[in-house]
């Protein structure tokens, strides 16, 4: 154990202040000035003094000690040096900041280009307390925009032009760019070139391009003149640094240990940074010599530029904008390259690092282990150790471990003395003596033992259940083994997967791991509360076979099976046999009774009604009479009816057996039940035998002949459609052309063939058929897989369509060109049993390849998406006041998920209680014949009183209380009343009025037989009702989200993890034919807050939603119609006086399209087309001929050629003029669902659609989040994000609790604008520099933080991990305050000047 009090507390970093070092700091921090180009001395090859490898900066040689601190290579942490530059140079990291400051100041007097009044206003905004980085950067942007527009300095009246970048690290000032008339300043500037023009007259032609060159020296002098107040306006803090520090005057030389020399065969290879430092020193010395001796200015400028590039590449070797000649021959690693990227310092060594006390090997299954155990090989157990402190209780055991030593298990590797801290390795020395000398308080690093806590992890770690705590079971052999039921959360299989093991090194860590990450506490997925640890594959098959109606066991067999599942310590009470004569037999279902309730002392009484996979309802019969025994009914842990299949013992179902035990009796009982099932099923199936062979998939003769008939019939139907298409008489489906209609019809015909053949195949295979058993019980495969093996593989689909034509208008060279026949487009009529023909094999391979490519692409896409989600949401946690806050205490949600409930504990679909099952459970547990039955009005009265209890009103959500009340009234009281009415008794929903004689008769005078018959059907007692209400309250309180829960991280994983199960390229037909993007691309669009999306669709409700004709009228108003759609022809007319285009309008088409337009409307559309620029007088309307004439210009000045070409232009552009509808709506589709008609519109323009006559504007929405925000505001955008992500997930059959999606929606919109989860959005969401640096654009964020003197308070998750600080989340969310007892009254200390001797005597007159 750790000592309770520790006086040696390590210091914790409270905050990081970023800034820019000035020359003084570089000299002060540096231990030596680096001024020599030589690395080693010529005499003895030792590091040269004042060279780049000077020993004062540390050493990279094991034999030499540091000259500054005297330590060896292992202990010296290194010291900085500095290089003094001959001339200042620009800093590549602050180049953008330098450019911005130059744009903001006068290039003569360095004053900020604002008036005094503007300065005061901006300073007031910048000095506002509590201002965040986003707001500050917006103010600085406004100042920059303002200054860029100023043409003269208000202080010195100097001209100001454009300051811009010219090539890498070059800034120019085009002072006279905006001068219209020549001014004195410009004249003077021009005259300054007179002398040069005399010498080189050719310069005159380039004089107009002359500009000021703002070299580093000039910029440095300008920056030195900036006043402290102006520094604030430039976004800098004059206390921490000034603008002139943005330029290099001294360059730091990093410690030698981060740029070590590699010695090889008498020579050394130097690090890239060392080489660059020598290059900088050499160039600087050349410039210094040139300045002292004098040299042509061109040479000096060239050397200065070279030094500038060298220093830039020293910082960032991937500097943009370099000429190929300036690029190094091989890429070098500058400072930026060492920090950024996956392998850089941030992501590779700070946020994520390699750890000690971890092991990795192949995994294999072992059903004999408990689900919370992991079998660890002896070899690993002897290497991984746990530091156990010696106490009186464990001293003897630890002494035995020490005597065994490191090579015998259970042994120990090290002993650490408590007083001296000396660590002793037990491979050497006298172990017996060491064991005898062991003192209380010493630490023994012992081997792993049984029941030690370890963390078990499989990569990729997609959600929090990818790393969980197991208990060790040390076993022989070489693999890590665990129970197969735990494969689900790890997504593990045993085809060669490897997994990692981590050993927590303190008692607190062990406890926390067990409580928070233990298997028993993580049986359900936090994504939606569904069970994730449950029976799998063979276990399900065995359970199914055992629970069939025809499975009977004698006493020997059932005793054997019961012993399979228990350990020797559990007492078993066999249930009474189901058949007594001629001999005692038990049913397979009774085995499950023992599994749930092994003996009479067990308190587990399961009550459950659930549909299994084989359930089919028969009219006029109760569900448990299902012919396939497909309705499971359990009462008090006894199976009354139903088989046990995947839906009962598998994962992903909330009405499964283990989930019910978990919710009613806790995690311990549920884990115990899963362990029993896995032991029993593995052993039972091993003895019974279960195999699959080729004869299992052999089709019978009748199946083959029926398949032949069905396939030939489908081919004939397809040929008929192809013939209609060829003749052009195929009737088009809504929103499709003939080709698309043909494809849709053939596809539906062929898919029906496979389904029909599959049905026949299922009927023909016997009940003992192994593949069919597996498909039926859900342990592996589906009925489609079986029918593909036996009967027919079916149509191959590529990107949602039949196989496309590859080359020369055909899918393969084996077919005719443009063939649409099923065989030519990927229909495989053979089964895998009969074998595929060569063409079928190729089609099947094409389809298979698409799946592989899709998976590979999807993995990278979803991985990056998950990382971005995690980075943006990781800081969010629930606080003690119920709010969800970010690390800097910004409120993101006032109540988590609008109700404060944890998705992990949701029993129903997003509800804390599954009322129906809870009611059945309460009724069966509290059944007593002697309790009096309640009447409907008594039930209502009791529940109203119970729900008005303060414990409900203060702790529960009002909606939850109302849901309970509604359930009891509708499902219990009213049902009882209806049963009474059917038995001719008064319903009694209201309390009888004692004054009314009719009411007084009541139940007392009703026949006993009738009352009994009602009670046989439904009998409600007060005890049952009380139990039900109490259970509801308990479950609700348990489901409340705990303070400190990392709701953000769990939400990010819950959205990111299902992404890996989604297909990538997925299109889905919304309604009839509006093709919408789904899957990963759609989720990406939403979380990126994309301005343009691939398939924007507006859904509009119609005022008259029953009449199709009125829907067509509205469609005509919305869908854009081109001129070419409503014209018969357009012809050119060349007359003696005028030439024009004659457009013949077809009013039959206009009436068919239900368009409300006239000739005048079409003419107006033509002259309003901006592309044509036709004056209105050139467009004339002829109503009698229903024609529009578009004339060429009437001025008569145009030549014949001009007139001809103008007519051709008109003729080309006019057909595409939009004459009706909304130009941004490409098309609209009428969709009829459940009798109601609605419109789907492809395109944008929500506001225009909402204002269209015939559309209900308040019930119109779009799937384009940004458009929703622009038209309806930020709340609408939030709702749109939530509904769109939910819809996309649901379309892929994935359930994600809405609370996770709501949190994402709130994070994206809580700043008042829709911020995408991208590097730009995250930068606006977070203020922390380290968090942004560990995400993307590492060095950019660090340079920006330094330039604006940012302060990082280190409160978020990323920052705390980088700096090794405990993150304020989970068990660390609270702070402890120790109240000291004041023994005596504290008196204030006397001040120095209160001492009388220090006072002068007062002199009185």
Swiss-Prot record:
SUPFAM superfamilies: beta and beta-prime subunits of DNA dependent RNA-polymerase
An annotated Gene Ontology molecular function: DNA-directed RNA polymerase activity
GO BP of this protein: transcription by RNA polymerase III
Keywords: DNA-directed RNA polymerase, Magnesium, Metal-binding, Nucleotidyltransferase, Nucleus, Transcription, Transferase, Zinc
Amino-acid positions noted as binding Zn(2+) 1 in the UniProt annotation, renumbered to this chain: 66, 69, 76, 79
Gene3D superfamilies reported in the protein's UniProt record: 1.10.132.30, 1.10.150.390, 2.40.40.20, 6.10.250.2940, 6.20.50.80, RNA polymerase ii (3.30.1490.180), RNA polymerase II, clamp domain (4.10.860.120), RNA polymerase Rpb1, domain 3 (1.10.274.100)
Pfam families listed in its UniProt record: RNA_pol_Rpb1_1 (PF04997), RNA_pol_Rpb1_2 (PF00623), RNA_pol_Rpb1_3 (PF04983), RNA_pol_Rpb1_4 (PF05000), RNA_pol_Rpb1_5 (PF04998)
InterPro entries: RNA_pol_asu, RNA_pol_N, RNA_pol_Rpb1_1, RNA_pol_Rpb1_3, RNA_pol_Rpb1_3_sf, RNA_pol_Rpb1_4, RNA_pol_Rpb1_5, RNA_pol_Rpb1_clamp_domain
Main location: nucleus
Region (Bridging helix): 838-850
EC number: 2.7.7.6
Classification via NCBIfam families: PRK08566.1
Function field: DNA-dependent RNA polymerase catalyzes the transcription of DNA into RNA using the four ribonucleoside triphosphates as substrates. Largest and catalytic core component of RNA polymerase III which synthesizes small RNAs, such as 5S rRNA and tRNAs. Forms the polymerase active center together with the second largest subunit. A single-stranded DNA template strand of the promoter is positioned within the central active site cleft of Pol III.
Family: Belongs to the RNA polymerase beta' chain family.
UniProt protein name: DNA-directed RNA polymerase III subunit rpc1
Organism placement in taxonomy: Eukaryota, Fungi, Dikarya, Ascomycota, Taphrinomycotina
């Amino acid at each position: 154990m750790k000592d309770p009090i520790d006086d040696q507390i390590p210091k914790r970093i409270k905050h990081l202040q970023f800034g820019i070092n000035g020359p003084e700091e570089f000299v002060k921090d540096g231990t030596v000035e680096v001024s020599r180009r030589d690395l080693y001395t010529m005499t003895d090859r030792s590091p040269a003094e004042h060279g780049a490898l000077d020993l004062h900066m540390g050493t990279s040689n094991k034999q030499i000690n540091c000259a500054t601190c005297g330590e060896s290579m292992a202990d010296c942490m290194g010291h900085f040096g500095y290089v003094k530059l001959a001339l200042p140079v620009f800093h590549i990291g602050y180049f953008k900041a330098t450019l911005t400051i130059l744009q903001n100041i006068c290039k003569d007097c360095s004053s900020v280009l604002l008036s005094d009044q503007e300065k005061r206003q901006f300073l007031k905004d910048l000095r506002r307390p509590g201002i965040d980085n986003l707001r500050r950067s917006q103010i600085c942007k406004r100042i920059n925009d303002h200054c860029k527009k100023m043409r003269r300095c208000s202080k010195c009246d100097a001209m100001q032009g454009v300051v811009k970048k010219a090539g890498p690290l070059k800034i120019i000032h085009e002072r006279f760019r905006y001068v219209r008339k020549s001014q004195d300043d410009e004249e003077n500037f021009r005259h300054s070139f007179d002398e040069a023009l005399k010498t080189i007259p050719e310069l005159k032609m380039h004089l107009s391009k002359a500009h000021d060159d703002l070299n580093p020296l000039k910029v440095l002098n300008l920056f030195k003149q900036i006043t402290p107040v102006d520094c604030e306006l430039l976004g800098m803090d004059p206390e921490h640094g000034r603008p002139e520090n943005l330029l290099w005057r001294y360059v730091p030389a990093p410690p030698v240990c981060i740029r070590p020399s590699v010695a090889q065969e008498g020579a050394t290879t130097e690090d890239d940074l060392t080489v660059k430092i020598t290059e900088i020193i050499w160039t600087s010395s050349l410039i210094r010599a040139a300045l002292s001796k004098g040299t042509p200015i061109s040479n000096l400028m060239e050397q200065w530029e070279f030094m500038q590039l060298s220093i830039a590449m020293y910082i960032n070797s991937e500097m943009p904008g370099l000429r190929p000649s300036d690029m190094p021959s091989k890429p070098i690693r500058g400072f930026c390259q060492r920090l950024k990227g996956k392998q850089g310092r941030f992501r590779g060594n700070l946020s994520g690092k390699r750890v000690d006390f971890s092991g990795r090997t192949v995994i294999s299954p072992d059903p004999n282990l408990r689900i919370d155990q992991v079998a660890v090989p002896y070899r690993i157990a002897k290497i991984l150790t746990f530091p156990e402190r010696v106490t009186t209780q464990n001293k003897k055991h630890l002494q035995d471990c020490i005597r065994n030593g490191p090579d015998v298990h259970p042994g120990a590797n090290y002993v650490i003395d408590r007083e001296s801290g000396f660590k002793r390795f037990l491979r050497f020395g006298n172990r017996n003596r060491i064991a005898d000398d062991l003192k209380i308080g010493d630490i023994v690093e012992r081997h792993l033992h049984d029941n030690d806590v370890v963390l078990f992890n499989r990569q990729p770690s997609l959600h929090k259940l990818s790393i969980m705590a197991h208990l060790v079971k040390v076993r022989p052999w070489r693999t890590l083994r665990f129970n197969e039921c735990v494969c689900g959360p790890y997504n593990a299989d045993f085809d060669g997967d490897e997994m990692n093991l981590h050993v927590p090194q303190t008692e607190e860590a062990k406890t926390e791991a067990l409580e928070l990450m233990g298997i028993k506490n993580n049986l359900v997925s936090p994504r939606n509360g569904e069970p994730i640890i449950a029976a799998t594959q063979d276990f399900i098959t065995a359970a199914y076979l055992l629970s069939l109606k025809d499975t009977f066991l004698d006493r020997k067999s059932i005793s054997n099976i019961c012993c399979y599942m228990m350990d020797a310590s559990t007492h078993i009470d066999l249930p009474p046999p189901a058949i007594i004569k001629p001999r005692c037999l038990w049913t397979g279902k009774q085995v499950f009774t023992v599994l749930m309730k092994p003996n009479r002392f067990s308190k587990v009484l399961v009550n459950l009604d659930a549909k299994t996979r084989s359930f089919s309802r028969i009219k006029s019969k109760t569900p448990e009479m299902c012919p396939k025994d497909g309705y499971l009914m359990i009462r008090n842990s006894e199976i009354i009816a139903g088989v046990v299949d995947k839906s009962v013992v598998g994962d992903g179902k909330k009405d499964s057996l283990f989930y019910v035990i978990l919710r009613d009796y806790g995690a311990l009982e549920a884990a115990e039940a899963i362990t029993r099932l896995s032991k029993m099923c593995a052993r039972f199936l091993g003895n019974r035998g279960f195999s699959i062979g080729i004869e299992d998939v052999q089709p019978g003769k009748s199946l083959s002949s029926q398949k032949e008939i069905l396939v030939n019939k489908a081919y004939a139907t397809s040929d008929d459609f192809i013939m209609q298409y060829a003749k052009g008489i195929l009737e088009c489906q809504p929103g499709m052309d003939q080709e698309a209609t043909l494809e849709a019809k053939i596809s539906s015909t062929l898919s029906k063939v496979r389904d029909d053949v599959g049905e026949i195949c299922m009927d023909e295979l016997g009940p003992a058929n192994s593949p069919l058993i597996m498909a039926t019980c859900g342990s592996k495969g589906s009925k489609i897989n079986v029918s593909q093996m036996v009967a027919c593989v079916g149509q191959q689909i590529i990107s949602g369509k039949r196989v496309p034509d590859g080359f020369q208008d055909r899918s393969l060279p084996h077919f005719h060109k443009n063939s649409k026949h099923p065989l030519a487009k990927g229909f495989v009529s053979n089964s895998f049993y009969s074998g595929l023909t060569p063409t079928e094999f190729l089609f099947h391979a094409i389809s298979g390849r698409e799946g592989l490519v899709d998976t590979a692409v999807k993995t990278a896409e979803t991985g990056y998406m998950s990382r971005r989600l995690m980075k943006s949401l990781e800081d969010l946690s629930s606080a003690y006041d119920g709010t969800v806050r970010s690390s800097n205490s910004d409120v993101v949600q006032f109540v988590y998920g609008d109700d404060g409930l944890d998705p992990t504990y949701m029993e129903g679909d997003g509800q804390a209680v599954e009322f129906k099952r809870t009611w059945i459970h309460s009724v069966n547990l509290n059944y007593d014949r002697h309790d009096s039955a309640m009447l409907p009005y008594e039930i209502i009265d009791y529940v109203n009183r119970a729900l008005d209890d303060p414990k409900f009103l203060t702790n529960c959500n009002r909606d939850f209380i109302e849901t309970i009340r509604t359930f009891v009234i509708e499902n219990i009281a009213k049902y009882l009343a209806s049963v009474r009415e059917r038995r001719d008794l008064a319903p009694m929903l209201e309390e009888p009025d004692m004054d009314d004689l009719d009411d007084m008769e009541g139940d007392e005078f009703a026949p006993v037989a009738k009352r009994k018959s009602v009670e046989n059907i439904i009998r409600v007692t007060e005890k049952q009702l009380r139990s039900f209400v109490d259970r509801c309250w308990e479950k609700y309180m348990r489901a409340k989200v705990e303070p400190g829960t990392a709701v953000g991280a769990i939400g990010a994983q819950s959205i990111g993890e299902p992404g890996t199960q989604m297909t990538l390229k997925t299109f889905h037909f919304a309604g009839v034919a509006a093709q919408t993007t789904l899957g990963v691309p759609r989720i990406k669009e939403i979380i990126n807050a994309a301005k343009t999306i691939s398939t924007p669709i507006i859904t509009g409700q119609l005022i008259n939603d029953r009449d199709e004709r009125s829907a067509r009228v509205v469609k005509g108003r919305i869908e854009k119609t081109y001129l070419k759609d409503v014209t018969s022809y357009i012809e050119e007319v060349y007359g003696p006086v005028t030439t024009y285009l004659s457009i013949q309008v077809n009013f039959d088409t206009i009436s068919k399209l239900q368009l409300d337009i006239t000739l005048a409307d079409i003419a107006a559309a033509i002259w309003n087309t901006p592309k044509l620029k036709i004056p209105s007088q050139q467009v004339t309307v002829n109503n009698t001929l229903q024609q529009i004439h578009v004339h060429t210009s009437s001025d008569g000045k145009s030549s014949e050629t001009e007139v001809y070409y103008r007519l051709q232009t008109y003729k080309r552009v006019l057909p595409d003029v939009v004459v009706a509808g909304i130009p941004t709506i490409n098309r609209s589709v009428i969709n009829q669902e459940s009798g109601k008609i609605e419109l789907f519109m492809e395109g944008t323009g929500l506001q225009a659609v909402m204002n269209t006559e015939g559309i209900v504007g308040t019930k119109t929405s779009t799937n384009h989040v940004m458009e929703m925000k622009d038209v309806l505001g930020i709340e609408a955008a939030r709702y749109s994000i939530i509904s769109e992500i939910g819809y996309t997930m649901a379309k892929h059959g994935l359930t994600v609790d809405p609370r996770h999606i709501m949190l994402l929606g709130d994070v994206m919109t809580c700043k008042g604008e829709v911020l995408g989860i991208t590097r730009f959005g995250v930068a606006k969401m977070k203020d922390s520099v380290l968090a942004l640096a560990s995400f993307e654009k590492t060095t950019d964020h660090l340079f920006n933080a330094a330039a604006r003197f940012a302060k990082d308070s280190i409160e978020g998750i990323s920052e705390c991990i980088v700096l090794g600080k405990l993150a304020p989340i989970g068990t660390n969310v609270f702070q402890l305050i120790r109240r000291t007892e004041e023994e005596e009254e504290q008196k204030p200390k006397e001040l120095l000047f209160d001492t009388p001797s220090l006072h002068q005597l007062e002199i009185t007159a």
